[in-house]
Amino acid sequence: MSRYDLVERLNGTFRQIEQHLAALTDNLQQHSLLIARVFSLPQVTKEAEHAPLDTIEVTQHLGKEAETLALRHYRHLFIQQQSENRSSKAAVRLPGVLCYQVDNAIQLDLENQIQRINQLKTTFEQMVTVESGLPSAARFEWVHRHLPGLITLNAYRTLTLINNPATIRFGWANKHIIKNLSRDEVLSQLKKSLASPRSVPPWTREQWQFKLEREYQDIAALPQQARLKIKRPVKVQPIARIWYKGQQKQVQHACPTPIIALINTDNGAGVPDIGGLENYDADNIQHRFKPQAQPLRLIIPRLHLYVAD
């Protein structure tokens, strides 16, 4: 497929996402809102977009106000829709839930509508990340050439739909991206970097090359069977824990956008019990279970690369 055809499909798919989101938000407003609870988080400024989040203050919104914020959030796809001071790199998050009363016919209609939106979002992400054939660093410029100001993460994010929950509880999750590597794999990566000299602020080209050479020497000095691990922290995320009484099971969802809960009165479902979301404080995290960590030694800080001792 030609690059021109891909761009045509990209734009066409995105227009469909916008149209279907507009139709969904209009549709939801026609149905009976049983309960709504969303939690706005402080906006991340451009100056603080790379800073670690040690505390997050939560503001709760209820009822129609919560619904208005949620429906607007689903359609928040461009930086032009937000403050100039707000970071375009930091994710815009609005955890919470909207609960609507439905019968069998309405439930099926909304399920199909949301499934279609999620299919379009997945297709759009596939075009950008796979079909474009571009490395991650080049995708941003390519997408924004055709869709200026697009917040790609918001365009990718699918909607979460649940049916007849008994309870909904919100919380915070701290995660790491973990990848195991061999010594030779790391050396291969560093070789590629050494073969393409460049400057990386605040270092000059020569300083950066020297830094890479030192890193290469440090890794080469390790035994070939050394166990290396990238353990990169991900910014804390809001989550929702859903309890289904009939199935006697709990399901956990990432919750960057409000969940849509359908309460089917044809099946005798009742209004769920919905909890709040506490402020986040990194110094007061309580772990239900924290396994004994493997002893690790940091060897290349910029890569979050550790070696197992």
From Swiss-Prot:
Keywords: Cytoplasm, DNA replication, DNA-binding. InterPro entries: DNA_replication_term_site-bd, Tus_dom1, Tus_sf. One of its GO terms (cellular component) is cytoplasm. Pfam families: Ter. One of its GO terms (molecular function) is DNA binding. Transmembrane segments: none annotated. It is found in: Cytoplasm. Its main location: cytoplasm. GO terms for biological process: DNA replication termination. It comes from the Bacteria. NCBIfam families: rep_term_tus (TIGR02648). Trans-acting protein required for termination of DNA replication. Binds to DNA replication terminator sequences (terA to terF) to prevent the passage of replication forks. The termination efficiency will be affected by the affinity of this protein for the terminator sequence. Belongs to the Tus family. This is DNA replication terminus site-binding protein. It comes from Salmonella paratyphi C (strain RKS4594). The lineage of its organism: Bacteria, Pseudomonadati, Pseudomonadota, Gammaproteobacteria, Enterobacterales. The gene is tus.
